[in-house]
From Swiss-Prot:
It comes from Verminephrobacter eiseniae (strain EF01-2). Keywords: Ribonucleoprotein, Ribosomal protein, RNA-binding, rRNA-binding. GO terms for cellular component: small ribosomal subunit. One of the primary rRNA binding proteins, it binds directly to 16S rRNA where it nucleates assembly of the body of the 30S subunit. HAMAP family: Ribosomal_uS4_B. This is Small ribosomal subunit protein uS4. It holds the Pfam family Ribosomal_S4. InterPro entries: Ribosomal_uS4, Ribosomal_uS4_bac-type, Ribosomal_uS4_CS, Ribosomal_uS4_N, S4_RNA-bd, S4_RNA-bd_sf.
Length: 207
């Protein structure tokens, strides 16, 4: 399955919620009505969605939100299932621990896609070492930073300014002047803030 390269707002409308695929510079909420799906008949109400349909839709939504394809998403679920604790919460923690997501959460990229590009282009270091793997799992205590030669990029400064205005999550501590941040702790489930029902995903894979 190839990565989706079409309009990002269309994906958010399809899922009925903001997937945070667009920069805060032009919020999807200002341009799209999430209660209608894309297409000519998007506003028409259809038959009740089956339990399987709801579970599948939730999985698709989370995959698109984090930019993860099916095979890799399945591996995350299997890893979450093998850990102690709640499988759904474990799954979200693994997704949140991805380097591209941490870069996004720290405000170095205005979207996860932009953060993924920064990682792939070797603009990011972890504990002083260059890491260009977006799926790299950041650990508690890791220091994530923008490389010195990349700090001059205007998009990074703009993203940091926006993130500072919106506010950053409690599990990261960012020094905006140095463009570096500490991954302080594993986020609690109620700190994610996203409209996710991970239990539906667990039910889907448990079939």
């Amino acid at each position: 399955m190839a990565r989706y390269l079409g309009p990002k707002a269309k994906l958010s409308r399809r899922e009925g919620t903001d997937l945070f695929l667009k920069s805060a510079r032009r919020s999807i909420a200002d341009k799209s009505k999430f209660d209608s799906k894309p297409g000519q008949h998007g506003r028409t109400s259809g038959a009740r969605t089956s339990d399987y349909g709801l579970q599948l839709r939730e999985k698709q939504k989370v995959k698109r939100m984090y930019g993860v394809l099916e095979k890799q998403f399945r591996r995350y679920f299997e890893a979450a299932e093998s850990r102690k604790g709640n499988t759904g919460a474990n799954l979200l923690f693994l997704l949140e621990s991805r380097l591209d997501n941490v870069v996004y959460r720290m405000g170095f990229g205005s979207t996860r896609a932009e953060a993924r590009q920064l990682v792939s282009h070797k603009a990011i270091t972890v504990n002083g070492q260059s890491v260009n793997i977006p799926s790299y799992l950041v650990k508690t205590g890791d220091l994530v930073a923008v490389r010195e030669k990349s700090k001059k990029q205007g998009r990074i400064a703009e993203a940091l300014q926006l993130a500072t205005q919106v506010g950053m999550p409690a599990w990261v501590e960012v020094n905006t002047e140095k463009a570096e941040g500490l991954f302080k702790k594993a986020p609690d489930r109620d700190e994610f803030g996203a409209d996710i029902n991970e239990s539906l995903i667990v039910e889907l894979y448990s079939r």
